[in-house]
Amino acid sequence: MLFTLGWASLAAMFSFSIAMVVWGRNGDGTLNF
């Protein structure tokens, strides 16, 4: 259970970072970090 939860959170963080990179290269500008 704990291993599955950790793996799911790791995959979520990885996909989120990929999405941030894609949005950054897109030059959307709605999210200003």
Swiss-Prot record:
Keywords linked to the UniProt accession: Electron transport, Membrane, Photosynthesis, Thylakoid, Transmembrane, Transmembrane helix, Transport
Instruction: Please state the protein's primary subcellular location.
Output: membrane
Subcellular location, record wording: Cellular thylakoid membrane
Q: Which Pfam families match?
A: PetN
Listed under GO biological process in this entry are: cytochrome complex assembly; photosynthesis
Q: Which cysteines are joined by disulfide bonds?
A: none
Is the keyword Signal assigned to this protein? no
Q: Which family does it belong to?
A: Belongs to the PetN family.
Task: Report what the protein is called.
Answer: Cytochrome b6-f complex subunit 8
Described function: Component of the cytochrome b6-f complex, which mediates electron transfer between photosystem II (PSII) and photosystem I (PSI), cyclic electron flow around PSI, and state transitions.
Subunit structure, briefly?
Answer: The 4 large subunits of the cytochrome b6-f complex are cytochrome b6, subunit IV (17 kDa polypeptide, PetD), cytochrome f and the Rieske protein, while the 4 small subunits are PetG, PetL, PetM and PetN. The complex functions as a dimer.
Q: Which gene encodes it?
A: petN
Q: Which GO terms describe its cellular component?
A: cytochrome b6f complex; plasma membrane-derived thylakoid membrane
The record ties this protein, via SUPFAM superfamilies, to: PetN subunit of the cytochrome b6f complex
Q: Which GO terms describe its molecular function?
A: electron transporter, transferring electrons within cytochrome b6/f complex of photosystem II activity
Q: How does it sit in the membrane?
A: Single-pass membrane protein
Q: Which residues cross the membrane?
A: 2-22
